């Protein structure tokens, strides 16, 4: 049986919605839906897992201590564990749908 990542997107959300699609001890795959959401001005993610994210719909800006990264559909980034970051902006007029993969293992990047 298959599911579709774009099914049942929440319409009105007071905050970003994170849904775990599948997980194991070392990997968690999530659907993240934002609709004009951003991290609080004084909040930084500083997590013990690595995180790979791709924007599937919408757009976003991620802020790091050393600069800003703009992301559009198809853009992906690998964020190493403990690299401080925050969501600075997501598209206000449509849902931004991300696929996020959090992992503990050391992986080699292709290419």
Q: Language-model segments: what does each one mean?
A:
Residues 25, 48, 67, 83:
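A generic "binding-loop/recognition-motif" signal
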Residues 1-42:
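A short, N-terminal "cap"/entry segment at the start of jelly-roll beta-barrel domains
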Residues 66-81:
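Short acidic-glycine-tyrosine-enriched beta hairpin
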Residues 82-108:
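Ligand-binding loop in jelly-roll beta-barrel domains
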Residues 46-61:
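Short, conserved beta-strand element in jelly-roll/cupin
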Residues 59-61, 68, 84:
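Structural motif
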Residues 28, 61-63, 86, 97:
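General beta-strand recognition
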Residues 19-21, 41-47, 64, 88-90:
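Short histidine-centered beta-strand/loop micro-motifs
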């Amino acid at each position: 049986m298959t599911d579709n990542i774009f099914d049942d997107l929440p319409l009105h959300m007071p905050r970003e919605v994170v849904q775990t699609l599948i997980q194991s001890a070392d990997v968690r795959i999530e659907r993240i839906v934002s609709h004009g959401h951003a991290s609080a001005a004084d909040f930084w993610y500083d997590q013990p897992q690595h995180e790979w994210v791709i924007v599937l719909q919408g757009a976003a800006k991620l802020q790091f201590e050393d600069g800003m990264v703009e992301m559009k559909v198809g853009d992906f980034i690998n964020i190493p564990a403990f690299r401080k970051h925050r969501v600075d902006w997501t598209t206000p007029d449509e849902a931004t749908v991300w696929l996020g993969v959090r992992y503990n293992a050391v992986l080699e990047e292709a290419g």
